[in-house]
Amino acid sequence: MKNNVKLLSIYTLLVMSMNACTSNAAINESPSINNVEIRTASNKQITSEKRTITSFSTMEVSTGIDVVYYPTSEKPYVEVYLDAPNMQELKTEVSGGKLKIFFKNTKEGKKRKRAKVVVHGPIAEAVEANAGASIRIEGDLTVKGDLNMETSAGASIVASKDIVVDGKLDIEASAGSNIRWDKKISAKEADIEASAGSSIKGAILIVEKKSEFDVSSASKCNIANITTSILDIDASTSSQATFSCGQTRKISIDASTASTVDVSNVVNKGDITIDKSTGANVKAPR
């Protein structure tokens, strides 16, 4: 009889332990959208809300919000993941063709968890993230005109698929922010600027005409593979510009104030002009 009581006690403890583990797993589980994880806080009850929006051509995301953007031709809508007390403070408004995603109440000292927003909408001609916000583009993007990507104040934009721009590509990262693309971007022209400790990193960049790079104030620009007709680089104040490989017909470099430019592995089929001063370092094709 005593043995049966002991066995029953052990079994009860095992069941309680398994239930506790299952309960903890449920609390800490993070939802995902098409295999993109939406991280949530375990100490808050996260709720989700689907909102319909009107069509837009540009997008701006601000403080404390992470956006996953899926370009689509279907009717646009957003999905918001946030703790219930703050749900009504998060705004997803379209005005003048711009989708703005932001918190209405941004009083100093007010603490809240980061919001996760999934956007299903049309092709955007401009995406902007600021004040620590992030945008991840999950889908091929084909822009009929120009495309502008801009980050500031610790924000980030990441493109995980190919981007085709019929017009000009404008990329600007400032104040410790980051812009990165993991696949290929192709465009007619490109104007790319990194300043104030920011970072721009790209896998493949194909530009039919001129590509201009302006890297300054301890910023970094790293393009793994570039193909362009004219490569124009201006680097200053301890900045770095690196092009791992590629080809061009003309290279123009202006490097100053302890900056570093490396285009040594780019095949250049034409003229190369180098102007360096104040401790700058330039590695160019032989």
What are the roles of these predicted feature ranges?
Residues 1-286:
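Intrinsically disordered, low-complexity terminal regions
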